[in-house]
Amino acid sequence: MATTVAATKLTSLKAVKKLGFREIRQVRQWSPLQSAMPHFGMLRCGSRQSFATSTVVKAQATAVEQSTGEAVPKVESPVVVVTGASRGIGKAIALSLGKAGCKVLVNYARSAKEAEEVSKQIEAYGGQAITFGGDVSKEADVEAMMKTAIDAWGTIDVVVNNAGITRDTLLIRMKKSQWDEVIDLNLTGVFLCTQAATKIMMKKRKGRIINIASVVGLIGNIGQANYAAAKAGVIGFSKTAAREGASRNINVNVVCPGFIASDMTAKLGEDMEKKILGTIPLGRYGQPEDVAGLVEFLALSPAASYITGQAFTIDGGIAI
């Protein structure tokens, strides 16, 4: 009997030691326009070696330690950078990844107070978080942001490029400054962050990058020529980055949200809401958590290790 118990304990210990960076998580939003127009600015089409959720590993390691008295090697939590993470979809993504056990850098442009609140929520879940104020369309800010994460935690495993803006107007009225603002942040910002992250990930031969685009980048939308061009650019850019990073085990994917519930959609009024919902086959808005769940899957799940260069719509069926 004693021999059987000892053998069982040894087998359990070996199983836990083999976990490595495995993750056992389940998969769990069109962000509103900056104007009252009922269009797709309300739409945010925002590694083979997998990462582990610390709570899963801790639970199994504790069980083995209690039965054997032996310590199990610590599995480090993934380090994640989320841009535009102080509110909306970005906030939901940061919270989801923080709850999953990640160490999260919460990037913001102007909303310092909101970013601090997100950071505190992550810490309340038992995770770790830091905030960083910076404009991702500026190379110096991006370099400083990545350095902040590395100085704090030693590496970067996942980058989620979510930061974005809208400057909506019809093409014939659009000023070059409105075009430039959207392209600079929504497309050039993704380029700069992806480039900086790839340099880090190539050295470690592992990493995952998720870029938030929009259904608008796939089907277009009246009054959003700048936004549609930027988001379509993100999709094409991501496919190229995926091809270039594949040999170094770097996965790059795109998430394209449709209409996502927000403070802005809540102010549209009943008539406008009916018109919008009439364009959505599922007949309802998505939730920020819907997008966050898909991002979490692509960022952490072992089941996503063979997925790269793909653009996933999460839009209630608008792009069918």
UniProtKB/Swiss-Prot annotation:
Q: Which domain of life is it from?
A: Eukaryota
**Enzyme Commission number:** 1.1.1.100
One GO cellular component assignment for this chain's record is: chloroplast
List keywords of the entry alphabetically.
Chloroplast, Fatty acid biosynthesis, Fatty acid metabolism, Lipid biosynthesis, Lipid metabolism, NADP, Oxidoreductase, Plastid, Transit peptide
Q: Which residues bind substrate?
A: S214
Q: In which pathway does it act?
A: Lipid metabolism; fatty acid biosynthesis
Q: Identify the InterPro entries for this entry.
A: 3oxo_ACP_reduc, NAD(P)-bd_dom_sf, Sc_DH/Rdtase_CS, SDR, SDR_fam
Q: Where does this one sit in the cell?
A: Plastid, Chloroplast
Supply the enzyme class, top level: oxidoreductase
Q: What is its main location?
A: plastid
GO process terms (BP): fatty acid biosynthetic process
Q: Which residues bind NADP(+)?
A: 82-106
Q: Which PROSITE patterns match?
A: ADH_SHORT
Q: Name one Pfam family in it.
A: adh_short
Does the keyword section mention ATP-binding? Answer: no
MF terms in GO: 3-oxoacyl-[acyl-carrier-protein] reductase (NADPH) activity; NAD binding
Alphabetical list of SMART domains matching this protein: PKS_KR
Catalytic center at which residues?
Answer: Y227
Q: Transit peptide extent?
A: 1-60
Q: How does it assemble?
A: Homotetramer.
Its family remark reads: Belongs to the short-chain dehydrogenases/reductases (SDR) family.
Name-wise, this protein is 3-oxoacyl-[acyl-carrier-protein] reductase 1, chloroplastic
- Species of provenance: Brassica napus
**What's the gene?**
gbkr1
